[in-house]
């Protein structure tokens, strides 16, 4: 229905963003992994590559950072037993390049670790993923990179990203500060956020 939507990122919450385009606000489902990358672009112009899932009572828009990820999602949900929620969960867990590596290595265990994917489904998926995923990698370069503004500090970006996912500011500041202490000075936001979330989860499991 739409190839992409270009507009202002006006709102984010876990699993959802709103893009304003020509006076309309498009509610779009997206992976939390990508939403964390977008935190520094709130109230700025972005491009979202979209896929529409038509249901009996509604049309649901899913958004992706590249055409490659969108085509991967399209391929995933074509498999029996893999719906949009599970397809998005796979892309939330693995970047497209990582998913290609998993397919090449036939790492069924890694794929089966995704919520909603059991061992049998992972084994069935692996055959087609290994064959088809490499064709999508060139499309993965078609992203919204050219619309990114100059970055503020990773600390500020990280706090904004966690706040967008519902963490209180005080908790977000603590999580980012703890993660930064474990990484080199030149660590990127993409490296900091997974460490912050992992350490926070470990702390919750201990309590």
UniProtKB/Swiss-Prot annotation:
One of its GO terms (cellular component) is Holliday junction helicase complex. Signal peptide: none annotated. Residues 155-207 are annotated as: Domain III. The keyword Ubl conjugation does not apply. One of its GO terms (molecular function) is ATP binding. Residues 145-155 are annotated as: Flexible linker. Residues 1-65 are annotated as: Domain I. Gene3D superfamilies: 5' to 3' exonuclease, C-terminal subdomain (1.10.150.20), DNA helicase RuvA subunit, C-terminal domain (1.10.8.10), Nucleic acid-binding proteins (2.40.50.140). The RuvA-RuvB-RuvC complex processes Holliday junction (HJ) DNA during genetic recombination and DNA repair, while the RuvA-RuvB complex plays an important role in the rescue of blocked DNA replication forks via replication fork reversal (RFR). RuvA specifically binds to HJ cruciform DNA, conferring on it an open structure. The RuvB hexamer acts as an ATP-dependent pump, pulling dsDNA into and through the RuvAB complex. HJ branch migration allows RuvC to scan DNA until it finds its consensus sequence, where it cleaves and resolves the cruciform DNA. This is Holliday junction branch migration complex subunit RuvA.
């Amino acid at each position: 229905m739409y190839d992409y939507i270009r507009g202002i990122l006006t709102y984010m919450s876990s699993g959802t963003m709103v893009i304003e385009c020509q006076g309309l606000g498009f509610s779009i489902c997206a992976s939390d992994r990508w939403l964390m990358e977008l935190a520094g672009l709130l109230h700025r112009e972005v491009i979202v590559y979209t896929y529409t899932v038509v249901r009996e009572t509604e049309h649901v828009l899913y958004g992706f950072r590249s055409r490659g990820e969108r085509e991967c999602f399209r391929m995933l949900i074509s498999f029996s037993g893999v719906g949009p929620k599970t397809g998005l969960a796979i892309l939330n867990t693995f970047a497209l390049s990582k998913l290609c590596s998993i397919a090449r290595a036939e790492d069924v265990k890694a794929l089966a670790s995704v919520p909603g994917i059991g061992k049998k489904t992972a084994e069935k998926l692996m055959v087609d993923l290994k064959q088809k995923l490499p064709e999508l990698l060139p499309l993965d370069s078609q992203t919204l990179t050219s619309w990114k503004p100059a970055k503020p500090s990773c600390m500020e970006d990280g706090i904004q990203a966690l706040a967008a996912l519902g963490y209180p500011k005080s908790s977000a500041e603590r999580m980012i500060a703890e993660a930064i202490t474990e990484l080199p000075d030149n660590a990127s936001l993409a490296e900091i956020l997974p460490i912050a979330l992992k350490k926070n989860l470990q702390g919750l499991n201990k309590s």
